[in-house]
């Protein structure tokens, strides 16, 4: 089982941010375990094989997102520090702990899914329609935690508990599964053998990757402890109201902004030669990854970093100039990705330490421009100005005769250039200006909402408000 919260968290770090994050973890006073060989050599770390309380790595679905998974007490400690160090990103946290035992009360069928409530959280309960009976109470385990606001947690019947080496599950189909990271055939055979007596008692066993480092006696003891914990969780859940009855894992996704990636660049540079935009390129422009590697080798030989960055920006500008069109992609605090559609690239150049890009779209349909409340007509032009060092993207709307219909200034984190898109975190609050009228702030309440939910940090909210007030005069 997990060790009490008084212990310093043990952290496993993987992925494209590993060097910067390992430096952060060490500076925060936490213990790095199961380091990769490169990280162990880079930081002169011992190859500790102790089980991790928290794992931090880039998400398999989006390399601009950090995935943080671990015991809730440990994740709480990590997040408190991380939100201070990387304040300009979005933080999404699971609404129910993964692999926890819960008691849910059925609400009923909705869109052919059985919906139940655990406290104030709605979740999908995986049962037959005939078992989806209003007010029925079910003891189950969380198999999908629901991380982003629009994601619904998922529960299956049967209690479950998680520990350092295994997950033990009440199951009508007892079986043994083993992490793909346990590669030794001998170890896999041993794990299967140890679990046999538990499957015979009606439990499913999943061995976690850390099990490859433990001895047989420790693993057998661990399963016995999990069995006791599961029985206790089952008993308390049956006797208590709907709620969470065993410790699970918190799951957090952090969508890193360009500003926070630059902070990670600086942290990495304190360990090994790193140029600005390292993490932006590694996460969003993998085709330029070797260019970054080469530039950093050259920097290590004494070449000025500013010259290397200038060359990198000019390379990106030349690539953009050779294209005709590019997408504009908002990342919303809700977790949605909103594409504005492809725009024609009119010009692109380097100015100081920034890329300046001018885009144009031609309107083909009728309607009303959101925020401006101005009629949209076929033939209108939308000219968009993007600077990669500014916290805004400016859209100016023109009638076919060239008359300005209005200006919409999107407040966002400094834009990044991906392989086929301009990407930024949309901060919801915006500025609109009609001809002859003063600029006006819109959608400030949306920013407040996501701040209250903990998705937007206080520092990011204050930054967005500062920009909005300055632009509104």
UniProtKB/Swiss-Prot annotation:
UniProt KW Protease keyword: no
Stored Gene3D superfamilies: FomD-like
Protein's job: Probable RNase involved in rRNA stability through maturation and/or degradation of precursor rRNAs. Binds to RNA in loop regions with AU-rich sequences.
Organism: Hyperthermus butylicus (strain DSM 5456 / JCM 9403 / PLM1-5)
UniProt-recorded name of the protein: Probable ribonuclease FAU-1
GO biological process, one term: rRNA processing
HAMAP family referenced in this protein's UniProt entry, alphabetically: RNA_binding_AU_1
UniProt key word RNA-binding: yes
Annotated GO MF terms: mRNA 3'-UTR AU-rich region binding; RNA endonuclease activity, producing 5'-phosphomonoesters
UniProtKB keywords: Endonuclease, Hydrolase, Nuclease, RNA-binding, rRNA processing
EC number: 3.1.26.-
Similarity-based family: Belongs to the FAU-1 family.
